[in-house]
Amino acid sequence: MSTTTMNIASAPIEVKRIYWPKSTISYTDSGYLVGWKYSTNDLIVVTTITSYQSFANFLVDYCKNQDQSVDIKSLCILGTFNCSADILPGDKYEIDCWIKVQQSTELSHPRVFDSASTPLKINLHIIYYHPPQPRKMQFLSLEPLSLLLLKDSFINKSNPEYESMQHQQILLKKLKLHFPRRKENSWKRSLRSGLIELLNQSFEVRMLTHENNNKKNSYVFRLFDRVSSSTFYFFNSLFAYFIILLRIINEVILLAINYRPIPLSYNMMDIFVSARQVDLRLQQACFWPVQYMKLWVFRKSKRVAIEDYKEYIRFYNNLWLVANDMIFGITMSSFILENLHLVVKLIENITFEYAIKNVRSMVIWLVDTPAGLKLNNDICKFIMKLSVWVIDVWSNFLLHCLPWTPFLVQVVAISGFGGASLMIALISDFLSVMTIHIHLLYLASSRLYNWQLRVIYSLLQLFRGKKRNVLRNRIDSYEYDLDQLLLGTILFTVLIFFLPTIYVFYAAFALTRVSVMTCLAICETMLAFLNHFPLFVTMLRIKDPYRIPSGLNFEIVSFEPLKQDGFATLYLNCNSKPMSLGSMFEHYRKLARRLISHYLSKTTLISLLVGCPVPAIPAEQLYNIQYAMLPTKRISIRKLRDLLFHQKKFPYD
């Protein structure tokens, strides 16, 4: 025994991996082991057969089929299971990897014994795996599932996030050059997409080898298929024409939303949040027929492809989001319509109380030594009269629009039938319109305050004998005349005395504007929640984690030491690692980081301190994740017609 051990230790010991289905092969079975030889060191066991002739007939029948959903041609017999002696079949077996497996009880592990066809001593790794069921949309994957269309043509390459991602990929490629390549016979090198694809096909191959080939082909069934197919064709044609009609209406609305009267001017999407929301929903509606046809072809051809699963999850996640959005919208719409008078009265009170009266009272209060501050009376009265005039003009305009308030509330309520997101977008637009006077006062005060700071900074440079060189973008020394210094001193003194008064009014209007922007940010957060929440993915994660994998998890089960008639065997469990909550809400966290980095960033704080206007977050940053699930160029009406009636090639493949 010691001599054998020494010889084995001196010789190079190979490691072979056998992927064993955990639930499909029982200890009571016996016969030949059928599977794939992925490589010299990787064997995938699928099932057992009792007769080689039936297996040969199965290969002949299915190899004639051109539209194969699984890899049948490379199937072979890998060895025997619970057989007393090695019985070599015909020519469809692998002599260099022939294995002899025994399993005595249900709780015991399968043991691989030495045979004459395996002269070398090897170490075995038997990996138990659960064959994923394709009809239940189960599959294994090495990488987390992505809901985005990861194609170069669909990615905005001008986005800073894309540039950062490209930079990280370049660094990773350079980092790999500093490390030697691993050996082929290692876990890192053996786990490849081809092997995972074979594991995904194992369940369907087992069902094909054990299925009953008796098919009902009587005249009654043929007649029923003929009548039902003609009936379905008639209704499908009507439905296809209806989809094309809706596509034409969508195209007209999309052209109106994206129309620019003058090149480089603003369109409706750049001005209104509701227009952006309508554009998103119509773009999704244009892409849904393409997604549905791809899924229909996928189910008809019985293909097993991870990309089809991703398309399935993307499609139904959008449908569930839109369905829940409409449910919430109809609920809110019914509540508003039932309490129309109360809602109208509440809106009028809020608008005139907080947006008009309180702002007007604040401006008047700033004239009379606010918080004990002694301000310049003349400047205070001038700014106060100008601000009150703007507020009164806007108040009179709102009073003229007051009879239209019930109608506008009804419009917002009816928009809820298009989804709660559209209602929230309209509320955000109405809030922006109702507070135009606050925005104008904030812009005027910020411009005045920023201009005053710039002039004071320039006068400080004058006292230091410096002058800004605009052509070279630097500060050079300069000798000023006496009259220039005297005039600069007078202007500096006047501006310094005016600065507290200007700053107080600017701070008041900036605080009011920040309050309005906070309300708009809340609306944007709610829109992001309704547009990006992974509802369908969360339901799949709770119902069946195998449908949203994010990798593989290997766990050591047992170890059998080296024996005289066997091999040193390590038993492992290969389980699909479901997608974590962090990965599911990764896009949501990106949106939260964008909102926080925009409104609570250092740049925003500095802009408020120096009087630079703080704009709202760009719509591209708020919606680009949802648009990433859509193609950049929507399908044309002609291609949609060809796809529905002639089933031509998909435009986004």
From Swiss-Prot:
Annotated disulfide bonds: none
Record key words, sorted: GPI-anchor biosynthesis, Membrane, Transmembrane, Transmembrane helix
Any Pfam family hit: Gpi1
TM spans (from-to): 43-63, 237-257, 327-347, 382-402, 407-427, 485-505, 520-540, 605-625
InterPro entries with a match to the protein in the record: PigQ/GPI1
Recorded GO CC terms: endoplasmic reticulum; glycosylphosphatidylinositol-N-acetylglucosaminyltransferase (GPI-GnT) complex
Localization: Membrane
Major site of localization recorded for this protein: membrane
Function, in words: Necessary for the synthesis of N-acetylglucosaminyl-phosphatidylinositol, the very early intermediate in GPI-anchor biosynthesis.
Protein name: N-acetylglucosaminyl-phosphatidylinositol biosynthetic protein gpi1
